[in-house]
Amino acid sequence: MSKITIKTLKFSNVMSYGKDIVIHFDKNPVTQLIGGNGLGKSTIATVIEELFYNKNSRGIKKDALFSWNAPKKEYDMHAYFSKDEDEYELHKVVKSTAKVTLIKNGEDISGHTATQTYKMIEEIMGGDFQTFTKLIYQSVGSNLDFLKATDATRKAFLVNLFNQEQYKEMSETIKADRKEIANTLNNLQGQMAVITKILNGKNNLGTLQEPVEVPEFDEEPLAQELTESKIKAALAKSQEANITKLRNLDKAVQVAEQSFEPFKNLPAPTDQNEEISSVTRDLTIVTSRASEVKKRYQKFKQEASNTECPTCGTHLNTTAAQKAMDMARVEYDPLFKEKQSLEAKLEQLKKEQLEYVAYTRAKDALDKAVVARDEFKNSMSDASFEELNVQILQVQIRQLEQEIADGRSKVAIAKEHNATVELANAKYKAKLEQIEKAEAEMTEITSKLDGVSEAVADLDILIAALKNLVGYKLEHSVKVFEELINKYLSIMTGGKFALGFELDETKLQVVIFNDGNRTSMENCSTGQQSRINLATLLAIRMLLTSISKVNINLLFLDEVISFIDTKGLDTLVELLNEEESLNSIIVSHGHTHPLAHKITVKKDAEGFSYLE
């Protein structure tokens, strides 16, 4: 096993720190790092991780590593360490990019890139980042929850601790193979289920069906005959309409003749319209004159009747008025007689005009009826008025239509039946072909199924065997782990407490003994739990060191003693002082031990942290 000694760490402008911070790790077996919260005690472990592996276990982002108070984004890390007989110097400068320099025995052996250099560092340190950080750094949130963890988490940690990942990886590989083969098995079982279902339908396959003969049906002669019958029927309806119209026209002539019968043997009356107009004008003139004379007569009659003045009562002479009245009467009488004569004549003329109008209307109606009848008869041929039997033709049409429909129906039914038969036979042939194919495939699938089932069973046995092997190796390794824990626990608790691991079927139980009495972690005080956890932590590191390729001198205990009393801290310092080739850094806040070297973290006036 190679021995690595990290001797000195120098750094500048990292997080809370200023320039030129120096800490020597190999000078004292135990160093207490003291300071208030937030001053940067844990940062020292972070610097070591970032310098050696370009990552940190606290999950701090790269951009957050730059100094909080420096004007430039730039930091510097420097470490001096040895491996066996070789001396190394590791230097890292980070600005916008990172430059990493590795010097071995005074010779620069850096790679062309930072990535290549870090691969070289990992080979020198003899392990990956996880192994490195478990060896050098333990905090409240790292391995101290091991004893309270779930069974699965505890087992996973122990598998990793005892370097049994190879069995886990082998088991995972076999499980992956088993899953793949199981998928094949499921696929084959699915195929077999389909084949079985197909073969189960063999009894319900049925038989081939026979088609029927499609009857011969020549529709054309019937269709032609139907067309002719429809034409005849249409013609018959037209002739029937012509005959009906002619009858109506004859009837109209007869009605017109009856209306004209009173005027048939009489001379044609004369139109008296002009004479009526003339007599009407004369009557209007005579009536107007008679009315005027009558008004004069009435006036003179009124004057002749007034014989006394209404104002003075004097007797008035009415002779002139009486004479004018008589003259008006003489003038009115012939006008009145002439008016009566004209009125009588006008009455007679109107009567004669009414007779003329009645005659004219009857004569016009008769003439129009005769003309309409004659014109209609002349526009039609004699054949247009021949009577055809429409009912017989309609019966013929219905019979022909039914005969055509029946013929079509028989052909359609036969064709539909044959189409159904063809589809059913196609399905039958497809099922038969499917069954024959399934019978041919069944032997092959059965053979494959047997082989794959056997392979799955073998892998299940192998998985169970690996599980039992891991359990056996864990059980054996846990005894060594248990002895190592109890070695440290006896020192930390003065022999009061002991710890044991018990396998309950497949579960790994943690049992605590207090003065020989069985108890649990939950029943212990916080301080007692801290001592038990510290003993476990030291045992874990010792195991890691024993199974690793290298032994690293540095152990950084970051506030893992928060709940330990003064006596417990003294015991821890004394225990660590006795550990060979181990330089321990204990981060704490208060009590210090006289055997421990003390470094205090302080803050200067500019807000930068520094070591004193």
From Swiss-Prot:
Q: Which domain of life is it from?
A: Viruses
Q: What induces it?
A: Expressed in the early phase of the viral replicative cycle.
Residues the entry annotates as binding ATP:
G35, G36, N37, G38, L39, G40, K41, S42
GO molecular function ontology, one term from the record: ATP binding
- Segments forming a coiled coil: 163-193, 288-459
Phylogenetic placement of the source organism: Viruses, Duplodnaviria, Heunggongvirae, Uroviricota, Caudoviricetes
InterPro entries named in the record:
P-loop_NTPase, Rad50/SbcC_AAA
Q: Which Gene Ontology terms describe the biological processes this protein takes part in?
A: degradation of host chromosome by virus; DNA replication; double-strand break repair; symbiont-mediated suppression of host gene expression
For this protein, the record's SUPFAM superfamilies field holds: P-loop containing nucleoside triphosphate hydrolases, Rad50 coiled-coil Zn hook
- A Pfam family this chain is assigned to: AAA_23
| Gene name linked to the record | D13
Q: Share what the entry says about its subunit structure, partners included.
A: Could consist of two subunits: D13 and D12.
Q: Which PANTHER family match?
A: ABC TRANSPORTER ABCH.3
This protein is called: Probable exonuclease subunit 2
Family listed: To phage T4 protein GP46.
Q: What organism is this sequence from? A: Escherichia phage T5
EC number(s) per UniProt?
Answer: 3.1.11.-
- What does the UniProt keyword field contain? ATP-binding, Bacterial host gene expression shutoff by virus, Coiled coil, Degradation of host chromosome by virus, DNA replication, Early protein, Exonuclease, Host gene expression shutoff by virus, Host-virus interaction, Hydrolase, Nuclease, Nucleotide-binding, Viral DNA replication
Its job:
Possible exonuclease that may play a role in viral genome replication, DNA recombination, and host DNA degradation.
Q: Does the keyword Hydrolase apply?
A: yes
